[in-house]
Every structure is written in structure tokens, then in C-alpha cells.
């Protein structure tokens, strides 16, 4: 990306559980490679959380934060769970913004986060 003067490089990795230490080490390697290219990289680290994991999401954020500072969250599967409320507690504890939410499996089901819409959906208020 740098050689071709591209401003943005998106690195999407396979999902993994935070208790799989060998797989978590791969994230450290990615960060180290990026830092060799430019010490300021990565500029954004967004963790994608499955809303159905409930309280386990705290452990995920905690462990991923040990590898690199997170800058935001994407919350998926909000269309299939009532456990989305844990997201609010995570955002407060770790001071992280929600960047986007996933409300299905189609490409356009990933939407930029809208606090009003999210609040109403969480409370079961028709939007």
C-alpha cells in the first residue's frame, strides 16, 4: 500500500477466541510487521464482536487490548439476540465507540452505528 501510495490498507483476519494463545500471537506478528513499515501503524484497530457471546465479550476486549489499543468495535448478530446490552457496559468500561453494527448476513446489513436506532432496538421500541 505504501509503495503504491495507497492511504488505506484494511487487514481482515479470521475470527478467533481470545483463549487460543497461539492464534493471538499471530495478531502480535501482524502489528510488528506493520510497525516495521511505519512506526505509527496501525492507525485503527477495530474489534468485531459477536453480540451473542454475552459476558464473554468482556474477556475478548480485555485480551485483544493487551495486544494493541483498540479504537472501536463492530457488533454483529444484533438481529438474533437480546444480549446486545452487554455492549453498552463494554463501551463504558473500555471507552470504545461502536463503529458499526451487523443486523444480518447480507452485505448491506452492516450499518454505521446510530445511537438512537440502537437504543430503541435494545429497548424493543419500534424504529
Language-model features: locations:
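P-loop/Walker A NTP-binding module and the surrounding RecA-like catalytic core of P-loop NTPases
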Residues: 1-127
